[in-house]
């Protein structure tokens, strides 16, 4: 079961003026569940995005990247679950284009103004006719307050829908931010089997929106890992309708931009943490903090060496304080000039190791008590600089194997 995720209620997800969402049931993988989401955007909405760095990226990623960098404003997004349209060659590209073209005809825009997204099984042909046939159904229930249904429609192996809203004041104007995401397995930085859609009604220029999505991603979705597998389909899309009524934000030094950046990053980080908390088979949520490094990059290397380790993740599942595994991971993280005698390792607030070995004050029963909790914090102090980073992961349980062994059945 998900680790400490409060139940999401529809009224918690606030509408964004200028944006509507509609869902449909197309039976792409199985009948009786929402598996198509359409998002329509008002004119003058600005859109920015980041995508997977997997070289075997899916057809919709290729098409979405192309459309997003084109000269025409984006007017709609179409997302399907149950089929990734990845590893499908030219026919996959053709199917992604056909989906965009069909939606464009229905809403009266150009094909290049639609962004396609898919998630599901790889190397199976996209059932494009099912999707096209059910687009009118999705358009028929378009509504600005349909965020909860949208969060349900993009789920695959997720157990719970994921969404969050925040409101901030910018120079006396209320600005709303709402986001949804899906993801449970194949979660790894740059990015993952993760789809995220965040929208705001703030007025902000396109270059700043591009900066915002990259900044938020680096501090959220690129700070999580479930199993170390990088997906073919992941994307994070940030949309700004500009209908809040605030004075348009045009420079990054504007306090309004700093406030908006912090709020969007908070929403992205909460969504990313929900993905880890709902990790396939997860029973524990693990925070890995690495401090006092020379650079953020070396802190990140150490953090991911720990967070990716199957030995550490299974020890967390078993509540086994076999903490030498953490020291080993720090050692193979690739920090060439690391002085291990300076490194300090904490489990929660308990000092576990220092001076190259076990701390004199550490007692195994204290370690086990912390490991038995549903939330575990592992802290590493490199004591060689002022940089730091935080990464979130989960444990590795028997159910992870079962879920993925049964994925296509």
UniProtKB/Swiss-Prot annotation:
GO terms for molecular function: glutamate N-acetyltransferase activity; L-glutamate N-acetyltransferase activity. Substrate binds at residues 156, 182, 193, 280, 404, 409. It is an enzyme of class 2 (transferase). Pathway: Amino-acid biosynthesis; L-arginine biosynthesis; L-ornithine and N-acetyl-L-glutamate from L-glutamate and N(2)-acetyl-L-ornithine (cyclic): step 1/1; Amino-acid biosynthesis; L-arginine biosynthesis; N(2)-acetyl-L-ornithine from L-glutamate: step 1/4. It catalyses: N(2)-acetyl-L-ornithine + L-glutamate = N-acetyl-L-glutamate + L-ornithine; L-glutamate + acetyl-CoA = N-acetyl-L-glutamate + CoA + H(+). It holds the Pfam family ArgJ. The record marks 192-193 as: Cleavage. One of its GO terms (biological process) is L-arginine biosynthetic process. The keyword Acyltransferase applies. Its EC number is 2.3.1.35, 2.3.1.1. It is found in: Cytoplasm. GO terms for cellular component: cytoplasm. SUPFAM superfamilies: DmpA/ArgJ-like (SSF56266). Its main location: cytoplasm. The active site is at residue 193. The record marks 119-120 as: Involved in the stabilization of negative charge on the oxyanion by the formation of the oxyanion hole. The keyword Transcription does not apply. Transmembrane segments: none annotated. InterPro entries: Arg_biosynth_ArgJ, ArgJ-like_dom_sf, ArgJ_beta_C. Catalyzes two activities which are involved in the cyclic version of arginine biosynthesis: the synthesis of N-acetylglutamate from glutamate and acetyl-CoA as the acetyl donor, and of ornithine by transacetylation between N(2)-acetylornithine and glutamate. Belongs to the ArgJ family. Heterotetramer of two alpha and two beta chains. This is Arginine biosynthesis bifunctional protein ArgJ. It comes from Nitrosomonas europaea (strain ATCC 19718 / CIP 103999 / KCTC 2705 / NBRC 14298). The gene is argJ.
């Amino acid at each position: 079961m998900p680790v400490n995720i409060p139940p999401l209620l529809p009224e918690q997800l606030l509408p964004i003026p200028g944006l509507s969402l509609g869902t449909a049931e197309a039976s792409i993988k199985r009948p009786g569940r929402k598996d198509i989401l359409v998002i329509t955007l008002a004119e003058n909405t600005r859109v920015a995005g980041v995508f997977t760095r997997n070289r075997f990226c899916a057809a919709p990623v290729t098409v979405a990247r192309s459309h997003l960098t084109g000269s025409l404003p984006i007017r709609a997004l179409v997302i399907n679950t149950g089929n990734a349209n990845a590893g499908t060659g030219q026919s996959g590209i053709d199917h992604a284009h056909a989906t965009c073209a069909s939606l464009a005809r229905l809403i009266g825009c150009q094909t290049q103004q639609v962004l396609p997204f898919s998630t599901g099984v790889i190397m199976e042909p996209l059932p494009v006719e099912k999707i096209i046939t059910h687009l009118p159904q999705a358009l028929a229930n378009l509504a600005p307050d349909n965020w909860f249904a949208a969060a349900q429609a993009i789920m695959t192996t997720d157990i719970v829908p994921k969404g969050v809203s925040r409101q901030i004041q910018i120079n006396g104007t209320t600005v709303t931010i709402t986001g949804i995401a899906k993801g449970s397995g194949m979660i790894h930085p740059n990015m993952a089997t993760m789809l995220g859609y965040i929208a705001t009604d703030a007025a902000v220029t396109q270059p700043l929106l591009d900066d915002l999505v990259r900044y938020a991603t680096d501090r959220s979705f690129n700070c999580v890992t479930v199993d170390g597998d990088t997906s073919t389909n992941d994307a994070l899309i940030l949309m700004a309708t500009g209908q809040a009524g605030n004075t348009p934000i045009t420079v990054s030094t504007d306090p309004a931009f700093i406030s908006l950046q912090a709020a969007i990053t908070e929403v992205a980080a909460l969504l990313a943490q929900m993905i880890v908390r709902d990790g396939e088979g997860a029973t524990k949520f693990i925070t890995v903090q690495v401090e006092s490094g020379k650079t953020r990059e070396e802190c990140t290397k150490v953090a991911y060496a720990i967070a990716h380790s199957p030995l550490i993740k299974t020890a967390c599942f078993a509540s086994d304080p076999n903490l030498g595994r953490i020291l080993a991971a720090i050692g193979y993280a690739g920090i060439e000039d690391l002085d291990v005698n300076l490194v300090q390792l904490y489990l929660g607030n308990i000092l576990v190791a220092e001076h190259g070995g076990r701390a004199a004050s550490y007692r195994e029963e204290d370690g086990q008590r912390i490991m038995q909790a549903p939330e575990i914090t592992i802290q590493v102090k490199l004591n060689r600089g002022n940089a730091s980073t935080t990464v979130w992961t989960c444990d590795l349980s028997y159910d992870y194997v079962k879920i993925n062994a049964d994925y296509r059945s």
